[in-house]
């Protein structure tokens, strides 16, 4: 479940040109509880369809890739939407 970035980014001296989201398959209910808590603490709004938001996708991607969430803040908009859509599809269309 790799995503090739249209435009690579550099964060703290590390060049990132793709993201491997395969780790989503190993997430547990406990992992999701911590993601939902972090989402709320970071200002995520509402309790309905959090999984469809960019912030939720950034938190999930950070958790499964091991990259800090700040890396996901500097992705170009198109790559950010690509990550969001991939996370959404995992939870709603493949599950």
How should these model regions be labeled?
Residues 1-95:
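Short, surface-exposed, charged amphipathic helix/loop patches that serve as local interaction elements
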């Amino acid at each position: 479940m790799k995503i090739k970035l249209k435009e690579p980014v550099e964060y703290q001296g590390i060049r990132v040109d793709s993201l491997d989201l395969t780790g989503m398959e190993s997430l547990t209910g406990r992992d999701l509880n911590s993601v939902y808590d972090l989402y709320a603490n970071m200002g995520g709004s509402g309790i309905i369809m959090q999984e469809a938001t960019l912030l939720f996708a950034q938190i999930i991607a950070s958790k499964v890739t091991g990259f800090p969430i700040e890396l996901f803040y500097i992705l170009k908009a198109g790559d950010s939407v690509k990550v969001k859509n991939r996370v959404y599809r995992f939870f709603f269309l493949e599950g």
